[in-house]
Amino acid sequence: DPMNFKLLINDLRFDTTNIKYVADVSIATISFDPKNSELQDAANKLVGWCRSNGMALNTKKTKELVIHFGKRVDKKSIPYIVINETNIDRVESFKLLGVYFSSDPSWSTHVDYIVSKAARRLFVICQLVRAGISKCGIVLVYCSLVRSILEYACPVWHCGLKKSQSLETEAVQKRCLRILYPDLSYANALSITGLERLDERRESIVRKLFNQAKNPDHDLNKLLPHKNSDTYKPVTRDCYPYTIPKARTSSSGHSFV
């Protein structure tokens, strides 16, 4: 029973970040020295907890994802996590709650995944057009069946997209509108259907969530950067109210970490 399991794992307590969702548990930690990670200690505690509660950890379904920025990092030199005398598989990407995280870090794997999945569903749009369904109805189906895939959890990954990746997602919507209005330009088709560009919609969603998170009572408020000390200085283009961490590369500056 997933509900009983969720209640059972609620007493898991580690010094790491724990993500618990129904029948899944994910453990994350930050390490400046990859050779001295806290994950092995956390894994040992998890194994002990499982034994105490009459359960066994499935090592075949357990994966390790090492996320790093430096090009000089030799992942082969990083010790594998060992559970029950078995090395845990180390993967280049992993899907967590529907979003692919990669070791680069980048969003290439996730973008490829959502674009491919959404593009396959355009077949349904073609069938509806052939069946003579109204275009208004088809647009509703598109928003529910296709666009929802391209926007799922976008506050996590939108700001880290490259321009080419953003265009990849936009191309799916362009194909859909070309099926409905083959003689119109993309801009005119957007105007007629009342749809927005996907990048503009994602930007709006992200800004809305960010404004909500600025409320001290919001669950995500603790994840925001520290505010600048000079709170009386007016907010201008050159004066941002939050302290932004410095990044040496564009990939680290736009990553999810």
Predicted regions: what they are:
Residues 224, 228-257:
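Low-complexity, glycine/alanine/valine/leucine- and proline-rich hydrophobic stretches
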Residues 10, 25-51, 71:
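Catalytic palm subdomain of template-directed nucleic-acid polymerases
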